[in-house]
Amino acid sequence: MSTPVVSAATSAAGPAIVHCPTADLRGIVPGRVQASCGEAAIQYCLRAISETKRAAVDGIITCPINKEAIYSAGYPYPGHTELFAEQFADSKTCMMQYASDIACSFVTTHIGYAEVCQHLTGERIADVIELTNDALNLIRGTVPKLLVCGLNPHAGENGRFGNREEELLILPAIEKARKRGFDVTGPVPADTAFTPQSRKKFDAVICMYHDQGHIPIKMIAFDRAVNVTLGLSAIRTSVDHGTAFDIAWTGKADPGSLFQAVRLAANLSKTVK
C-alpha cells in the first residue's frame, strides 16, 4: 500500500504494509551493512513521522537501525532519537530504557567516551531529570523516585576522581529539580545504582552516558525493556537492542522487546492526546 488505511476490515486482516519507494533494494544481502538499507530505514522513519504529524496514526514503533548503514547513506544521525527530535523540532529530548521493574534515562548516548564531558552540562542533566519525572508520572500515574548517577568512579569521591563534575554539574542540577518538587537522590556511584535494594526503592536511574545504564538494563530486562523517546510531541517507542546482523534469518532473534514496545505505545496513545 502507498497510504495507510485503518478500518475494521484491514484490522481483521492484519496490519497494513506501507511501501516507501527508495533505491533499488533487489540486491540486499541479509545480515550485511548496506547504504541502500540505511536509505530505506531513514525513508520509512520519515514516512512514519509524516503520517503522525497529519494524525493518521497515534504513535510510532521502530525496529532497530544500523548506524553504519545510515551513515553510509549520507545521514549524520547517531540514532533514532536525534532524527525524531529534529523532525518534530523538539529541543529537549532524551532516551529512556523502560521496563516495569527497571528504568533509566540518559544524559548522553551515542558519542565516544572522550566526548562525554563536553556534552555534560547542568542544564542538560536538569532537563533529563524533568523529562524522566514527567514520563514516569504519565506512564504510572504516580510521583516517581529518581536516582542520579555520578560520572566518575565512586561518584567522584568528593572531588578526588575526575574534574569535580559531581560537585559542579550534577549536584546543582539535582538541587534545581528538588526545588521544583521532584523526588531526586544523588549523585551516587553507578556501581550500586542498580542493585536489587536500589531498584526496590527508586523508579528510575538517570545515567550520564550510554553503557552506564545499558549494561545493567540489558542484563536484567533484555527481552522486556523498551526504548522511549522522551520530550517528543509524539509517541515513539522502540526495542532496546540493535540489528543483530550476526543472527539475521536464523530464527534466533527474540521479539520480546518489540512486543513490549507495541504495548507501551498503545497504552500511551490512550493517555496522550
Where are these regions (language model features)?
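Amphipathic alpha-helix from the class-I
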Residues: 109-116, 156, 250
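Flexible loop/hinge segments that line or gate small-molecule binding clefts
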Residues: 75-105, 109-112
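Active-site glycine-rich loop that binds ribose-phosphate moieties when present
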Residues: 82-86, 90-91, 111-137
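Contiguous, glycine/small-aliphatic-enriched amphipathic segments in soluble metabolic enzymes
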Residues: 1-80, 123-208, 212-227, 232-237, ...
